[in-house]
Amino acid sequence: MSTRRKFIKESAIVGTGISLAPSMVFPFNSRPAVDKLKIAFIGVGLRGTNHLNNAIHRKDTEITAICDIDQNRIDIALDLIKKDGRKKPLVFGKNEDDYLNLLESPEVDAVVIATPWLWHTKMTVAAMKAGVYAGVEVSASQTIEECWDLVNTHEATGTHMMFLENVNFRRDIMAVLNMVRQNVFGELLHFRCGYQHDLREVKFNDGKQPYG
């Protein structure tokens, strides 16, 4: 079990680009190499559809399943997939918990989670427990307890997960990662961070437009 001090140190590395050297922090369970990754999407709203478009443009992916409770968004996603000449994926959207059935499908290797924030930790934990690689939109958690849920579940399952935060790969952020790896800061006991982005229109939007 991680101590809080160990967690702080690991978080500095995780938050600044763990994907570049995963073996430095946690042992991972790996699947055999495949020519095409079977990928599913939970949440195909504005953000999820953007991720779907990116996956469609890759020839090393199979879009095997989508999940959303909004039929209109499902229809939009299916249309994009059809226009690319791909096979129709499995569709899950009977209720808010239908994503659990998606995660049980043998046709899913990895999942992109782009639902409302309050669902991120719950869905990511479920994916890791199902042995499904998870890419989760920010913010991945809302509380300290949820942060620990992600850490503990990863350590228990060894399943890959990644925060879909492109800022991690900015040059200044990568410079900090390099400093952590070279032990410039020594043992990290306390740090502060923040999100410099006005989110009032996102958190209190009208439900129709993505930014109010």
PLM regions with names:
Residues 1-136, 148-160:
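N-terminal glycine-/serine-/threonine-rich beta1-alpha1-beta2 phosphate-ribose binding loop
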Residues 141-145, 171:
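Conserved PLP phosphate-binding loop immediately N-terminal to the Schiff-base lysine helix
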Residues 117, 140-141, 197:
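Short glycine-enriched loops at secondary-structure junctions
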Residues 137-139, 165:
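Short beta->alpha connector loops at strand-helix junctions that form conserved
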Residues 43, 47, 157-162, 167-212:
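Predominantly a Rossmann-like dinucleotide-binding segment in NAD(P)-dependent oxidoreductases
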